[in-house]
């Protein structure tokens, strides 16, 4: 798992270095695809439940599962790149939200505080603790910075399966009381918003999730 996670992180760095105005998310997908193969792995999203690309690229108001396409990124956009590699029998998953050129102060705050919220959620986890301590830490930080917490999409178990049984809400859910034990592997991937955390219906592609109010995430 550590090797797969490290490989995913290296791929994300390579893709992130290419993020710039005028670059298309299709081009980012191509970079990720080739980098994944160069590692000796396979891009986990490709053909997963019909998903057509090797990474997810979620721009501006897209919460998650954005499908790369031919539209160029423009100055001031923000884009989340979500990389997962299948390597040596297990999946490694990581993502980051990146600024395209210069972005506004609100967008910088969103990027920074979402990362801090994720780190605080990770720090809260530990053997013998219920999984809901993760969401409690994330939600507390988000609300302190007046950011919305998307509830429809949550972290998940990962390992030999891309998505396994454990569920990791990014908000405090008393019912999420699975006790964490050594050896568990799961994702912590909070999706925070500048406005309402409510989701609009999925796009016609059946993947792309966006904020109902069109605010950035």
Outline where the language-model segments fall.
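Active-site neighborhoods and metal-handling regions in enzymes and metal-associated proteins
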Residues: 2-217
């Amino acid at each position: 798992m550590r090797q797969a996670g490290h490989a995913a992180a290296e791929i994300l760095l390579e893709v992130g270095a290419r993020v710039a105005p005028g670059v298309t998310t299709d081009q980012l997908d191509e970079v990720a695809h080739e980098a994944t193969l160069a590692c000796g792995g396979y891009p986990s999203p490709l053909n997963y439940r019909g998903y057509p690309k090797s990474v997810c690229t979620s721009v501006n108001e897209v919460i998650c599962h954005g499908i790369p396409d031919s539209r160029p990124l423009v100055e001031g956009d923000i884009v989340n790149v979500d990389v997962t590699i299948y390597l040596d029998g297990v999946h490694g998953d990581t993502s980051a939200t990146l600024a395209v050129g210069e972005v506004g102060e609100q967008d910088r705050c969103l990027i920074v505080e979402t990362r801090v919220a994720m780190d605080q959620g990770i720090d809260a986890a530990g053997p013998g603790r219920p999984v809901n301590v993760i969401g409690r830490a994330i939600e507390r930080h988000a609300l302190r910075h007046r950011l919305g917490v998307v509830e429809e999409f949550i972290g998940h178990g990962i390992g030999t399966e891309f998505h396994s049984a454990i569920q990791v809400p990014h908000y405090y859910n008393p019912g999420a009381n699975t006790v964490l034990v050594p050896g568990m592997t799961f994702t912590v991937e909070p999706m925070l918003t500048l406005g309402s955390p409510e989701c609009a219906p999925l796009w016609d592609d059946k993947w792309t999730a966006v904020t109902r109010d069109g605010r950035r995430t």
